[in-house]
Amino acid sequence: MEKMRQQLMEWGKELETFRLPHWEELPDLELYMDQVRTLVDRYLSPVIQGEKHPLLTSSMVNNYVKLGLIPAPVKKRYNKEHVAFLLAITTLKQVLTIPEIKEGILFQGKTVGIREAYNLFCDEQEAAVWMVSQLAQGKSHPQKF
């Protein structure tokens, strides 16, 4: 039990510095599918662990295009808008259904625009992960602000 508690505290400490790239920090160049998948995995692996399957597959991306969750790539290349959508979808699908995610993305996109919606998503995710990190370290009633 003590070893598990120690591992939880170490994981909590690692999560303290977790950050998602905000819109301005996303790559400005066009990427191929494998590069996008690697990037999404790199950004999200600190918070989505223990999966025996990849966080994002080519089939998933193609399905998201077919379902209208993300725009189609241009000449098999993906831009920062695609990466932002895929980071949000991959994170949110851990707790929401695809139809719920689509509804939320469409609503937020229309309300504040894609950039602002994505940056708000990043801020909220970082705050939530920070809270989890504090609880994992045994700190009761953590407050960031």
Give names to the regions the model predicted.
Residues 104-145:
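Intrinsically disordered, low-complexity, charge-dense segments enriched in Lys/Arg
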Residues 2-108:
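Basic helix-turn-helix/winged-helix DNA-binding cores
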